[in-house]
Amino acid sequence: MKNIAENITYSSEKANVFQLKKSDKLKYFAVALGKNGVLKKHTAPVPSTLVVLKGEIHFVMENEQLHFRQFDVYEIPVGVEHEVTGISDENLFTVAQEL
């Protein structure tokens, strides 16, 4: 058994990523951000689903800024550059990638 809360820290300096599961078909991980913490620009090379478990985040891609709250679910567009910023003091989301 894995406990996410015991394996992450909320930092405004950098994203904290904790791998939950990896197989030849799935990569599943949790990302923790403190207030104003940033998951720097990157792309999702495969279909990916984001689920916010705690806090609020800004999800910025191209010229669009989205705001997600606890329990929001979002299908991340494949190949589109995006960046995520924490709004609350503690922000936690998971990403499931179909490999």
Regions found by a protein language model. Name each.
Residues 24, 45, 61, 86-88:
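A generic beta-sheet turn/junction motif
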Residues 32-34, 45-58:
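Short, conserved beta-strand element in jelly-roll/cupin
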Residues 1-25, 60:
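A short, N-terminal "cap"/entry segment at the start of jelly-roll beta-barrel domains
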Residues 78-99:
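Ligand-binding loop in jelly-roll beta-barrel domains
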Residues 63-78:
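Short acidic-glycine-tyrosine-enriched beta hairpin
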